[in-house]
Amino acid sequence: MGLDTYIFSVENPKDGKETPDVIHSAKFTYSPIKEEAYWRKNYFINSYIGELYEKKRKEDLTEFNFNTVYVKVTYDDIKKLKRKINTLPHASWEANSLDPKKYPTIRLLRGVLREIKDNAGKRTFYAMSNW
């Protein structure tokens, strides 16, 4: 099981406010919360997210289903993590074969934080895909 994170904003052309929008997918569930993201907590997440999870756990802990716990993080948290990921070597078969317990952030390289815009250009998604 992999890690999924998502961050996006939705603009309503009528009143300029955010509108609830849930897209059903096998891999993703999107939140209407602007410039925030949810990280699924599992043992592949590196120590940075682990510490963030413990620090924010009391106020931000949210359960989305029976066995998966997410923690809410800000866009700045995601940018800091992306900088950490960018300093690592590029993903390769060799990198992916490294022991995830010794090199946990290598696992994150298979899903690079990216920007996706819909056809109308009104919605922006920042998503790290499952592996």
For each predicted feature, which ranges?
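Acidic (Asp/Glu-rich) sequence patches and key acidic residues
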Residues: M1-R123, S129-W131
